[in-house]
Amino acid sequence: MKKILNIDGGGVRVYFPLLILDYIEQKTGKKIIDLFDYFSGVSSSSIVLSGLLTKYSVKELLILFKNLSKVIFYRSYYYIIKSGFGLFNSKYTDNYINEALKYYFGDLKLSDVKKPLTILSYDLQESKSICFDTYNFSNDYKLWEVIRGSTSAPTYYPPYKLDSYLLVDGGIVTNNLSELNYTKSISYFGKEKEFLQLSLGTGCYKPQKPQKSGLLSWINFNSISSNAASSFETIELKNLLLNNLKYFYRLEIDLDNDIMLDDYNSFEQMEQIFNKWLENNKTTLDTICNIITE
């Protein structure tokens, strides 16, 4: 049985899936790279999966992501004024994220990824999704550049130019890669294989009261659209539950209060939320751990 893993995008909230993966490694005594056969990521999860499949452990990524977030979501007072508080330019300059990704991934290329990985991005030039498959791409791009394209969240960062592509965050199409990951896995391994799929969300906040609809109320549009894309259950996937998709698990943590995608001060809060969620979902996680180690 082939085991496949996809993780949503969601800025700093990708810390939730990292905590889940940390639990799985502790419970099974095995590394994530050895437990799963195919991986898909978008936006911030492309950082996590690229790290896991090249040179970083889950423990290292838990620390790395905290440090990285403080760097890539930094704004000088000069830039805040220059950008008109994000009204005239992207909320953040891309100087810091570019240098940070170069630092953590160096000269690693798509071909250096040790297991099949699909990173989703979106090309503004052709108005279509682009899947960077580490095992089947005409150009062996540097990994940090592919990640950079997938993390170019509109309004947060400017698009990233990579050859003929003008790339932005693939999460504008979907943050939930369940269907894409399943389809890619069938294409890679063949229809005759049986599959287990684990799909990890990055926290979903559902407002309890109607919100005011003025301009300032829509400043957090990226957070809203991220929640919507993550909570969208792909009907097509449910219709594809053929005999070869033996197990499908979608883990999502409901949030009482929204956590903005760039809130790098929220990690302690996320740990508390995760621990509370784990109390009610430990049985499910343990079941998953037992199945993937059979």
Where are these regions (language model features)?
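Surface-exposed acidic, glycine-flexible loop patches that form ligand/cofactor-binding
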Residues: 28-33, 102-117, 186-191, 282
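Conserved beta-strand elements of beta-rich interaction domains across eukaryotes
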Residues: 9-12, 44-47, 54, 124-126, ...
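Extended hydrophobic secondary-structure segments that form protein cores and membrane-embedded regions
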Residues: 4-7, 37-43, 117-121, 196-207, ...
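Active-site gating loop/helix substructures
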Residues: 80, 111-190, 252
